[in-house]
């Protein structure tokens, strides 16, 4: 099987039951198919925790105004986050590589509120957003940078946004995934591994699959033909869902105006 970051691709088999300790449930929310995977034991291909995937129309045709997708995405993400406290949004990836630029492009549209007011505004959650870059450009690993930021800011949670890989071509640019297990790339030993055990705070991950292996074991990858639009529109869509999840007292339209 090709490498995949999507939990439901590993455990959703139409003709067999999931492994012991794994529960898979699928539901419809309007025009969005939501699949929840809950892993209750260690020793499987993914860490124990909750994973939510949302199958949506082509991301390249959506944006921050598509409430039919943003509202269910925000609700699923909100359920994985602590109900209160500051949140640090980390845009993981290389902004100079299109397929890897989802994280940095997303944080550009996050509604940042931390440090904006001397006195906290009632109903507005403190949020900071950073795109730390890649170690080749900074000389520091993602773990070092994330750890330093967490120690300084002391957030209630770290929310990491990253490009994902899928094993199914039809899901590229058509799926959102959220999880409360941290950033756990499919490739073993990958440097982008962030979790609560390493950082001391809950780590929630969000992403969209933007590439897949050309074949199992190959170093070649396949990306959607409309990759530029997937990244641009996907970043806007994810940012809108994140903003709505973190600031439920504000409407999608209000958040769009505040981040425009």
Language-model regions: role of each:
Residues 126-158, 163:
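Catalytic-core regions of hydrolytic enzymes
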Residues 130-131, 144, 160-260:
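A structural signal for small-residue-enriched, beta-sheet-centric alpha/beta enzyme cores
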Residues 105-139:
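Long, charge-dense
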Residues 1-49:
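N-terminal amphipathic/basic leader segments beginning at the initiator methionine
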Residues 41-81:
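An N-terminal, well-structured beta->alpha segment
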Residues 76, 98-115, 175-184:
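A glycine- and small-aliphatic-rich helix-loop capping segment at beta-alpha/alpha-beta transitions
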Residues 55-57, 86-97, 129-133:
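Short glycine-rich or small-residue beta-strand-to-loop segments that form or flank ligand, phosphate
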Residues 92-102, 136, 163-167:
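Gly/Ser/Thr-rich loops at beta-strand to alpha-helix junctions
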């Amino acid at each position: 099987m090709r490498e995949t970051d999507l939990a439901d691709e590993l455990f959703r088999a139409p003709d067999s039951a999931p492994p012991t300790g794994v529960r898979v449930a699928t539901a419809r929310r309007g025009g969005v198919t939501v699949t929840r995977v809950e892993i209750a034991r260690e020793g499987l291909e993914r860490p124990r925790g909750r994973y939510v995937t949302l199958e949506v129309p082509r991301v390249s045709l959506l944006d921050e105004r598509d409430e039919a997708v943003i509202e269910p995405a925000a609700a699923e993400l909100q359920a994985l986050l602590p109900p209160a406290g500051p949140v640090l949004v980390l845009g993981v990836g290389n902004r100079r590589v299109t397929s890897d630029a989802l994280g940095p492009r997303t944080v550009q549209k996050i509604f940042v509120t931390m440090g904006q007011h001397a006195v906290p505004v009632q109903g507005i959650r403190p949020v900071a957003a950073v795109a730390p870059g890649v170690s080749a450009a900074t000389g520091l690993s993602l773990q070092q940078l994330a750890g330093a930021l967490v120690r300084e800011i002391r957030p209630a949670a770290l929310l990491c946004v990253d490009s994902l890989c899928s094993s199914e071509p039809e899901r590229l640019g058509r799926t959102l995934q959220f999880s409360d297990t941290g950033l756990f790339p499919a490739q073993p030993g990958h440097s982008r591994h962030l979790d609560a055990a390493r950082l001391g705070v809950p780590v929630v991950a969000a992403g969209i699959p933007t590439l897949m292996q050309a074949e199992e074991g190959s170093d070649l990858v396949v990306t959607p033909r409309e990759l530029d639009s997937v990244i641009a529109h996907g970043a806007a869509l994810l940012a809108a869902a994140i903003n709505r999840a973190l600031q439920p007292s504000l409407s999608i339209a209000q958040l769009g105006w505040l981040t425009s």
